[in-house]
Every structure is written in structure tokens, then in C-alpha cells.
UniProtKB/Swiss-Prot annotation:
This is Ribulose bisphosphate carboxylase large chain. The gene is rbcL. The modification N-acetylproline is found at residue 3. It is an enzyme of class 4 (lyase). The modification N6,N6,N6-trimethyllysine is found at residue 14. CDD domains: RuBisCO_large_I. Binds 1 Mg(2+) ion per subunit. It comes from Jasminum nudiflorum (Winter jasmine). Its main location: plastid. Coiled coil: none annotated. Mg(2+) binds at residues 201, 203-204. The record marks 334 as: Transition state stabilizer. Its EC number is 4.1.1.39. InterPro entries: RuBisCO, RuBisCo_large_chain_AS, RuBisCO_lsu_C, RuBisCO_lsu_C_sf, RuBisCO_lsu_fd_N, RuBisCO_lsu_N_sf, RuBisCO_lsuI. Keywords: Acetylation, Calvin cycle, Carbon dioxide fixation, Chloroplast, Lyase, Magnesium, Metal-binding, Methylation, Monooxygenase, Oxidoreductase, Photorespiration, Photosynthesis, Plastid.
């Protein structure tokens, strides 16, 4: 460009590469109520200062690139850029830092978790200047939350639909997860529901395989639901997995479930994707269906302590995208989940206002401004001996799901369901009487087993089962 044709945008432009921290590290910045705030665990490459690493995260997840560009002069970077505004070392680690980044709200499309994640957890996670990067938490401002529908119905509406109050809901995943014919699958569902469970569930990888096509499964499960409801006088449900290879096919399956009159469908929200999940959540609200969410693939993303996305962020994203239930770990079962961390994101799922609490891994105060809550689902390696702990840890607003802990009963599915229902009712009754479930749990179960042969048999089968492994993802030590 000659001096005679120089444009206003190019005036003052100087080509080349400059340090990110000169533009994107702003420790004097005061965050706004409308900013999306992120807490990143940053592990820089040797020789990279934490200020440069934090600024690089802010830049590459917002307006920045590796070199200066003349089109910067066509917009206001101060208005749109992300800012690393605070950095603190991680206690007990020599090369890890928590970097706090503020993003202006105008960077994100309204009502789109997909767009939010594309920016905040996009290409920056492959940035060479960082050895590892993990998104620990997000503060979603009320102004952005109000652009989302959220869960199709929420906790209170679900209880009203089911007419079930004052206790956790009880579920079961049908096993074996793959290989059953549709008719045998429906029979297993019926036996569990008539035995006293509120829900049964498709496993996350049950979609529409050669051994059991989705339409056949839906029909036999609907028959099982209606037959068990007629026998027990209770409202029953089965999580019919609508997850499919295309969003159109997913919605078609949800439409068929609605036509059958069943109360709930299911989606694998991480493998299915946030766009598909939000579409399904909108359909479920419009058509009176509850939506159960499975988190298959989450551990690929969230299990490593120094790289990925913490599940509390995935849980917040799900509440925004939409779901009435989501699997949250058990604390006591076979799957990963430390107690304090798990209870932290359980509160983020259920409550309307959650204070910052680093002892539970919550980096920001979160106000959901009345967005409906999500029921946490405890599932994975649990059985009747775990019932007191689960009731005490998760409280009434939860779903406790016993797959092998129901279908593994020596007398069959229905007695397995009876054992779990008796154990749950005994724990709720004891808690309401003021007894301490943590210290008296085993006594409470043994007392109930005296008048329930089904529970007695279950207690005998699983009396030696333990999953005593330390969690991989743990809280940082205090300073």
C-alpha cells in the first residue's frame, strides 16, 4: 500500500509479533456483572511466564491471534477482547497457576452453549506454549442465562407429574446393556417397575442396533410401563434413549415416544452434542416429556486434573442446554467422584444461588436467576448397603439408580427392586425420625431386612463388595 492510498485502519499499524501480555494481561481490570468469568488451571511450558501464559489463554479464546493484523484497527479490541485479570499459584505445585479470564458478553451468541464452548474451550487447548490447560469453573452472568430455556421442566414440575414427594426417586439400568431382544428387554423393565422402582433406563449405548431396533424397544417398554402402573397404582417411566446418528432421527424417536404417552426420554448429551441436546430439550418442554441426560464420554474430558474441562463446567452447560436429570457420580460406588467436589456440582445443578466455596471447588458465586434445577443421578456400582450413605449425601431431590444392584438379585428383577425400595423407605423413615444415617446406616438396613426376605437376600449377596480406590481428581490443598 502506497502512502497516498493509506487507509485510516492502517494508520499506526506495525506488523510483527508481540507478547500477549502487553494486550491481554490486565491485572487492574474490574470485572463487570455481564462478563463471563473463567478459571483456568494453566501449566506453561518451561520458560513461559505465567502472565504470558494467562494472557495467551485470554487472547486465543477471544480476539487474539499469533501476530498483529491490520484489521485490528477496524474494531474496538478493548470492547471485545478477553482479559486475564488475576493469576494465583496452585498450592503444592511448582508449575501450575489458576488464571482468571473475563470475557465480554458480546462475544457469544445468545442461547448457544455450542458457541460459548467453541470460544472458551476451542483451539486454545492445543496451544504449544502450554503444557496443559484445564477449565475449572465458569461464572455465567444472569444476562446470558436469561437467553436459555434450560431444563424442559425442572425438579418441582417433575415431582408434580409423577406425584412423588419426600424421598429420592429410584431407578435401574437394564442389564446386560447390549444383546437383549426387544421383548426380553421389555420383560426386564416390567419386572423392575412392578417391584417398586420409579424408573428403568436404557443404557447409554442402546440406540438402534441389529439385535434390538429402537421402535420395537419403545413399544415393549411402553407396554411394560402401562402394565406395571396398572398393578401398582404408581406412575412409572423408562428412559427411552432417543440418541441417534442425526438430529432429525433423534427428534423422530422423541415424537414416537410422545405418541406412546410415556413420560420421559433420554439423550447422551456429550456424544450427541450440545446443539442436538438443546433442540431435544426444547421439544421436550413443548410436548410434556421429561428429559434424562447421560454423560457418556465425560471422563475423557474431565478426569485428568491438569487438562480438560472439570465436570462442574459440563454440569453448568447442561443446565443451560437443558435436561431434567444428569448422572453425577455416586461418591460411594465404582465411578470417579470425591465427596466435596461432587456435592459442589450437585448444588450447582439443583440450587438457584450458590456461593463461591473453594473448599468444594466452586470458584465463583453463581446466580441461576430461577432457571429450573436438574436432578442429580447417582449410578454406578451401588447396592442396598450404600442406600443410607446415598440418602444422606444426595437428599430427596435426586435419583438413585441400581443396575446390577437390582438385576443381580439372586431371586430376580422384581425381588431386586423390592429390596431397593424397602431399603430406601427404611432410610427415609429413619432420617425423618432424626436418626443419623452416616453412623446408623448398617443397623437401619439390618432392621429392615428382618421383615423383608428380598432385602435380606440382597444384603447377603453384596455384603463384601467395596470400591476402595482413591479419586484421581481431588481438591487442591489449602494455602
Amino acid at each position: 500500500m502506497s502512502p497516498q492510498t493509506e487507509t485510516k485502519a492502517s494508520v499506526g499499524f506495525k506488523a510483527g509479533v508481540k507478547e500477549y501480555k502487553l494486550t491481554y494481561y490486565t491485572p487492574e481490570y474490574e470485572t463487570k456483572d455481564t462478563d463471563i468469568l473463567a478459571a483456568f488451571r494453566v501449566t506453561p511450558q518451561p520458560g513461559v511466564p505465567p502472565e504470558e501464559a494467562g494472557a495467551a489463554v485470554a487472547a486465543e479464546s477471544s480476539t487474539g491471534t499469533w501476530t498483529t493484523v491490520w484489521t485490528d484497527g477496524l474494531t474496538s479490541l478493548d470492547r471485545y477482547k478477553g482479559r486475564c485479570y488475576h493469576i494465583e499459584p496452585v498450592p503444592g505445585e511448582t508449575d501450575q497457576y489458576i488464571c482468571y479470564v473475563a470475557y465480554p458478553l458480546d462475544l457469544f451468541e445468545e442461547g448457544s452453549v455450542t458457541n460459548m464452548f467453541t470460544s472458551i474451550v476451542g483451539n486454545v487447548f492445543g496451544f504449544k506454549a502450554l503444557r496443559a490447560l484445564r477449565l475449572e469453573d465458569l461464572r455465567i452472568p444472569p444476562a446470558y442465562i436469561k437467553t436459555f430455556q434450560g431444563p424442559p421442566h425442572g425438579i418441582q414440575v417433575e415431582r408434580d407429574k409423577l406425584n412423588k414427594y419426600g424421598r429420592p426417586l429410584l431407578g435401574c439400568t437394564i442389564k446386560p446393556k447390549l444383546g437383549l431382544s426387544a421383548k426380553n428387554y421389555g420383560r426386564a423393565v416390567y419386572e423392575c417397575l412392578r417391584g417398586g422402582l420409579d424408573f428403568t433406563k436404557d443404557d447409554e449405548n442402546v440406540n438402534s442396533q441389529p439385535f434390538m431396533r429402537w421402535r420395537d424397544r419403545f413399544l415393549f417398554c411402553a407396554e411394560a410401563i402401562y402394565k406395571s402402573q396398572a398393578e401398582t397404582g404408581e406412575i412409572k417411566g423408562h428412559y427411552l434413549n432417543a440418541t441417534a446418528g442425526t438430529s432429525e432421527e433423534m427428534i423422530k424417536r422423541a415424537v414416537f415416544a410422545r405418541e406412546l404417552g410415556v413420560p420421559i426420554v433420554m439423550h447422551d448429551y456429550l456424544t450427541g452434542g450440545f446443539t442436538a441436546n438443546t433442540s431435544l430439550a426444547h421439544y421436550c418442554r413443548d410436548n410434556g416429556l421429561l428429559l434424562h441426560i447421560h454423560r457418556a464420554m465425560h471422563a475423557v474430558i474431565d478426569r485428568q486434573k491438569n487438562h480438560g474441562i472439570h465436570f462442574r463446567v459440563l454440569a453448568k452447560a447442561l443446565r443451560m442446554s437443558g435436561g431434567d436429570h444428569i448422572h453425577s457420580g455416586t461418591v460411594v460406588g465404582k465411578l470417579e467422584g470425591e465427596r466435596d467436589i461432587t456435592l459442589g456440582f450437585v448444588d450447582l445443578l439443583r440450587d438457584d444461588f450458590i456461593e463461591k466455596d473453594r473448599s468444594r471447588g466452586i470458584y465463583f458465586t453463581q446466580d441461576w436467576v430461577s432457571l429450573p434445577g436438574v436432578l442429580p443421578v447417582a449410578s454406578g456400582g451401588i447396592h442396598v448397603w450404600h442406600m443410607p450413605a446415598l440418602t444422606e449425601i444426595f437428599g430427596d431431590d435426586s435419583v438413585l439408580q441400581f443396575g446390577g444392584g437390582t438385576l443381580g438379585h439372586p431371586w430376580g428383577n422384581a425381588p431386586g427392586a423390592v429390596a431397593n425400595r424397602v431399603a430406601l423407605e427404611a432410610c427415609v423413615k429413619a432420617r425423618n425420625e432424626g436418626r443419623d444415617l452416616a453412623s446408623e446406616g448398617n443397623v437401619i438396613i439390618r432392621e429392615a431386612a428382618k421383615w423383608s426376605p428380598e432385602l435380606s437376600a440382597a444384603c447377603e449377596v453384596w455384603k463384601e463388595i467395596r470400591f476402595d480406590f482413591k479419586a484421581v481428581d481431588t481438591l487442591d490443598p489449602e494455602k
